[in-house]
Amino acid sequence: MRLPVSFPLTVLSLLGSTIAHPYGETEAVLRSEPKSNQAKADAVKEAFQHAWNGYMKYAFPHDELTPVSNGHADSRNGWGASAVDALSTAVIMGKADVVNAILEHVADIDFSKTSDTVSLFETTIRYLAGMLSGYDLLQGPAKNLVDNQDLIDGLLDQSRNLADVLKFAFDTPSGVPYNNINITSHGNDGATTNGLAVTGTLVLEWTRLSDLTGDEEYAKLSQKAESYLLKPQPSSSEPFPGLVGSSININDGQFADSRVSWNGGDDSFYEYLIKMYVYDPKRFETYKDRWVLAAESTIKHLKSHPKSRPDLTFLSSYSNRNYDLSSQHLTCFDGGSFLLGGTVLDRQDFIDFGLELVDGCEATYNSTLTKIGPDSWGWDPKKVPSDQKEFYEKAGFYISSGSYVLRPEVIESFYYAHRVTGKEIYRDWVWNAFVAINSTCRTDSGFAAVSDVNKANGGSKYDNQESFLFAEVMKYSYLAHSEDAAWQVQKGGKNTFVYNTEAHPISVARN
């Protein structure tokens, strides 16, 4: 879904943890132990509004709020990432005033201007997908939310403008794009390779743009890059059927290694294989076939159970005939991927394994002091830190990085588990995670990343609020408790929307 975060970052400053949690409507609702799903959905909506109000007051039109110092940051080129990332969530929540404010902002963005390096991947999954999703929703099931059709049409116009700014990244000998580009000089960072997820997480958004505009160029560019991932060369780069290496040579499309994982940097390549089939099963059956191979190989070769907790299931990584017994919060989308694939393909074995993965990721949440899972962990009995031996014996893992940067993947998979099985326990887990995040990360203007989920109050607060708080954490928390709708994930082959890796619902192709 996105690359792992290492601390400290230049955009984050470590601050004390003695910030009082403001008691707004959400806090009152939480203290009253809401019983109904509607009350819980309303609590999530209030939390979204709390963060939105803080962003508008202190940071708009910049990319992010700094939720401790009440300032702003521009880690995504200064085009207002939080606003664009919030659009689809605001539509789903029916917040017309927020939606209109974002639409007016989008109309004014000049995507040809930035002084910073542009990430093709991040810009695609946040900005391009955010606008395409808003367009699909407002042209479809939410068509009565906004009156100004010109503003809605502007979403598609700006999507095309942005893609036209970015498309030179694909101008390489192979068609495998550069990720880090300079849109002013049409230069790049000189990289010789691109990552698996970065290369393989463009095809949904760029194909959708072609389908909406009738211009095949965008789909062809992204599908050309993807073609090298579907037919990996050399053969050694595919150590198990469907599971491929992590780096691709930009010059010739050949894989540069054979390191296999579902962790950050590799993750969303596998995520999009099955999602492209959901988007259009006629055009993308090959993608589905590759996902099935990868899923079957993952169960056979990467499934791992901690010795101290054999009831838990995590995914290991594989390289040079060695297994790495470690995982990440980013990886926890995996349960949702298996559940989606299982229900779409009517494969109960995939559903069952997806639920095993969901259980494992839930254990990383319920084992910590804050009831939020860490950014990374391991279960190699030979590498247990001396000060975590007791924790490892009880929890089944040891914490490698205890930070929490407002990531959504665990809640995301809880949501898929509830939608596919209908079991209330998974919706309860969404609520538990939301309550923990609201309690631990909330500030007077928004929500902050924290340094250690296994310390009181999450340790120290980082002065950063990623845009995906709006796009993903709030959306999945809300969807789990809201009424059925066209944009909800459905059992079987009934999905009319498919979610990109930033949780933006894209309308499936209509043949």
From Swiss-Prot:
Gene for this chain: MSDC
Residues at which Ca(2+) binds: 501
Oligomer status and interactors: Homodimer.
Residues forming the catalytic site: 375
This protein's UniProt keywords: Disulfide bond, Glycoprotein, Glycosidase, Hydrolase, Metal-binding, Secreted, Signal
Protein name: Mannosyl-oligosaccharide alpha-1,2-mannosidase
Top-level taxon of the source organism: Eukaryota
Compartmental location: Secreted
Main subcellular location of this protein, as a coarse class: secreted
One CC-aspect GO term: endoplasmic reticulum
Function, as annotated: Involved in the maturation of Asn-linked oligosaccharides. Progressively trim alpha-1,2-linked mannose residues from Man(9)GlcNAc(2) to produce Man(5)GlcNAc(2).
Disulfide cross-links: 332-361
Note: The enzyme is inactivated by reaction of carbodiimide reagents with Asp-375. Since the antibiotic 1-deoxymannojirimycin (DMM) acts as a competitive inhibitor, and it blocks the reaction with carbodiimides, Asp-375 is established as an active site. High activity in presence of EDTA.
Recorded family membership: Belongs to the glycosyl hydrolase 47 family.
EC number of the protein: 3.2.1.113
Cofactor(s) named in the record: Ca(2+)
Name of one Pfam family that matches: Glyco_hydro_47
GO biological process: carbohydrate metabolic process; ERAD pathway; protein glycosylation
Signal peptide segment: 1-35
Catalytic activity field: N(4)-(alpha-D-Man-(1->2)-alpha-D-Man-(1->2)-alpha-D-Man-(1->3)-[alpha-D-Man-(1->2)-alpha-D-Man-(1->3)-[alpha-D-Man-(1->2)-alpha-D-Man-(1->6)]-alpha-D-Man-(1->6)]-beta-D-Man-(1->4)-beta-D-GlcNAc-(1->4)-beta-D-GlcNAc)-L-asparaginyl-[protein] (N-glucan mannose isomer 9A1,2,3B1,2,3) + 4 H2O = N(4)-(alpha-D-Man-(1->3)-[alpha-D-Man-(1->3)-[alpha-D-Man-(1->6)]-alpha-D-Man-(1->6)]-beta-D-Man-(1->4)-beta-D-GlcNAc-(1->4)-beta-D-GlcNAc)-L-asparaginyl-[protein] (N-glucan mannose isomer 5A1,2) + 4 beta-D-mannose; N(4)-(alpha-D-Man-(1->2)-alpha-D-Man-(1->2)-alpha-D-Man-(1->3)-[alpha-D-Man-(1->3)-[alpha-D-Man-(1->2)-alpha-D-Man-(1->6)]-alpha-D-Man-(1->6)]-beta-D-Man-(1->4)-beta-D-GlcNAc-(1->4)-beta-D-GlcNAc)-L-asparaginyl-[protein] (N-glucan mannose isomer 8A1,2,3B1,3) + 3 H2O = N(4)-(alpha-D-Man-(1->3)-[alpha-D-Man-(1->3)-[alpha-D-Man-(1->6)]-alpha-D-Man-(1->6)]-beta-D-Man-(1->4)-beta-D-GlcNAc-(1->4)-beta-D-GlcNAc)-L-asparaginyl-[protein] (N-glucan mannose isomer 5A1,2) + 3 beta-D-mannose
Stated pH dependence: Optimum pH is 5.0.
